[in-house]
C-alpha cells in the first residue's frame, strides 16, 4: 500500500497494487464507481482543503508503483 499524491499534495488515502483505495482517516476502503462510458474504476478523493477530485484507479496505481 502506498500513499496517494494528487497535484503534489499528500493525502490521507492509500492505494494497493490491485487498485483498492483506503482512507486512513476513517480506516475504511472506498467504494469506487465504474464509468459507464469507458468502464474504468474511479474514486472521488477529498483533498486537504476540502476540494474533491475524481481519480481513476489505474492512474493512481501507476503513479504510486511505477516510480
PLM regions with names:
Residues 1-67:
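Conserved recognition-core residues within compact binding domains
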Amino acid at each position: 500500500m502506498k500513499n496517494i499524491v494528487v497535484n503534489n499534495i499528500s493525502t490521507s488515502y492509500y492505494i494497493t497494487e490491485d487498485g483498492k483505495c483506503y482512507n486512513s482517516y476513517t480506516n475504511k476502503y472506498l467504494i469506487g464507481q465504474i464509468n459507464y462510458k469507458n468502464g474504468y474504476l474511479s474514486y472521488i478523493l477529498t483533498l486537504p482543503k476540502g476540494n474533491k477530485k475524481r481519480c481513476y484507479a489505474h492512474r493512481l496505481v501507476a503513479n504510486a508503483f511505477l516510480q
